[in-house]
């Protein structure tokens, strides 16, 4: 185990964003220790069956998550607050040399929920039953570390920073007095701890509430106003995205910022 950990260890620079809108003085997420779990796969050889899901990301190809994704068990999913987190997984050859591929790892993003199956025991089909940590991975990601016929493999995993290109994106859905905001392409910790919104006609920040998956909502009347967001991710970093949503926006639109967590 120690040899695998040394081989895969990554050095992460805790660099705070230089932009003046950064706040907090908290360093970026560093890799966690290694933890044991198991992993299965779903979604087909092209991962087309992984689209949608309990994080609300929709088309994972279009959103940039691709096929390196997984559904998390209850023990990891945290009612959707883990959406967007990244994990590095290695098949544990000390436990299973038959179905584990040697010397390789894969990094996935949490994009879905693997529900419990109370009709089956936790060690025989009810893989996602609490309190088991379990990854139901997109098949192409799973096959990076496991041999297809194995079906289920023991893994060791660690949470790692998410590496993203471009800025955080905001998709606005809902209706008047209910703005439902989906965040995608979130770097560093990947998952959201808190979020505030301010309209161009509003003097103050207004706290948003976690709705489901990677989506947060506001009950204020903000239709048509330019919108700024203040986002805190789960490693404690806070960034302000000023006027990222232009006045006159419509529900269903996505707005890409040029700001990213590091």
Curated annotation (Swiss-Prot):
Top-rank taxon, per record: Eukaryota
Domain Expansin-like CBD: 177-257
Keyword Signal (UniProt): yes
One GO cellular component term: extracellular region
Cell compartments where the protein resides: Secreted, Cell wall; Membrane
GO annotation, biological process: plant-type cell wall loosening
Signal peptide: 1-22
Pfam families with a match to the protein in the record: DPBB_1, Expansin_C
Keyword vocabulary terms for this entry: Cell wall, Cell wall biogenesis/degradation, Membrane, Secreted, Signal
SUPFAM superfamilies associated with the record: Barwin-like endoglucanases, PHL pollen allergen
Primary localisation category: secreted
Tissue expression: Expressed in roots and flowers.
SMART domains, alphabetized: DPBB_1
InterPro entries: Expan_Lol_pI (IPR007118), Expansin (IPR002963), Expansin/allergen_DPBB_dom (IPR007112), Expansin_CBD (IPR007117), Expansin_CBD_sf (IPR036749), RlpA-like_DPBB (IPR009009), RlpA-like_sf (IPR036908)
Coiled coil: none
Domain Expansin-like EG45: 52-167
Membrane topology: Peripheral membrane protein
PANTHER family referenced in this protein's UniProt entry, alphabetically: EXPANSIN-A15 (PTHR31867)
Family: Belongs to the expansin family. Expansin A subfamily.
Record function comment: May cause loosening and extension of plant cell walls by disrupting non-covalent bonding between cellulose microfibrils and matrix glucans. No enzymatic activity has been found. May be required for rapid internodal elongation in deepwater rice during submergence.
This protein's name: Expansin-A13
Gene: EXPA13
